């Protein structure tokens, strides 16, 4: 059980005690004793912390857990309390994904690309950063704004996904370093 207690800056040092009531569906409420010791020290504002906290965020997992459409207004509202906890803990970095599944199959919720890549009918490329920009701006608005970690420039299987306007399908290029496609 995780309990978060917000202690006002002007709280007097000492021990505080009380009861914590725990409730759950289909269970009787229980009261538990709780004791908190307030130290004679006030932390500086989170913005001034020099500790570099960099925990990876997975917005795709939040959408799944909350059953909301990915990148919708409901998704951003569902992420707000989760990412605010990170900001309050001193998180400095935004985790952004440039390709699909940058960690291959190593996470339960696959990370998608925040950049849409389109090969146009004339063979030129379009890179749409709308989702990337919205995600980064959202995280910056919460105070997580010191660094953006972008994963990954090179995919595991050297497969680069894109939308092919000529076929109307999602496609990919499989390549190796040094090949014309890679260049």
Predicted segments, located by residue:
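Surface-exposed loops/turns
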Residues: 9-13
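Surface-exposed binding patches on compact interaction domains or structured appendages
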Residues: 1-3
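Aromatic-lined carbohydrate-binding surfaces of glycoside hydrolases
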Residues: 6, 16-24, 30-183
């Amino acid at each position: 059980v995780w309990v978060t207690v917000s202690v006002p800056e002007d709280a007097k040092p000492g021990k505080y005690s009380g009861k914590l009531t725990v409730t759950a569906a289909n269970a009787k409420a229980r009261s538990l004793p709780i004791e908190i010791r307030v130290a004679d020290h006030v932390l500086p504002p989170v913005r001034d912390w020099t500790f570099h906290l960099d925990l990876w965020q997975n917005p795709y997992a939040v959408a799944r857990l909350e059953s909301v459409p990915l990148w919708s207004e409901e998704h951003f509202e569902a992420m707000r309390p989760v990412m605010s906890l990170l900001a309050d803990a001193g998180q400095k970095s935004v985790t952004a994904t440039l390709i699909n599944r940058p960690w291959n199959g190593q996470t339960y919720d696959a990370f998608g690309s925040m950049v849409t890549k389109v090969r146009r009918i004339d063979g030129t490329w379009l890179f749409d950063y709308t989702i990337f920009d919205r995600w980064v701006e959202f995280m910056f608005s919460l105070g997580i704004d010191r660094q953006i970690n972008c994963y990954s420039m090179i995919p595991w299987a050297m497969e680069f996904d894109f939308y092919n306007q000529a076929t109307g399908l999602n496609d990919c290029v499989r390549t190796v370093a040094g090949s014309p496609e890679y260049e």
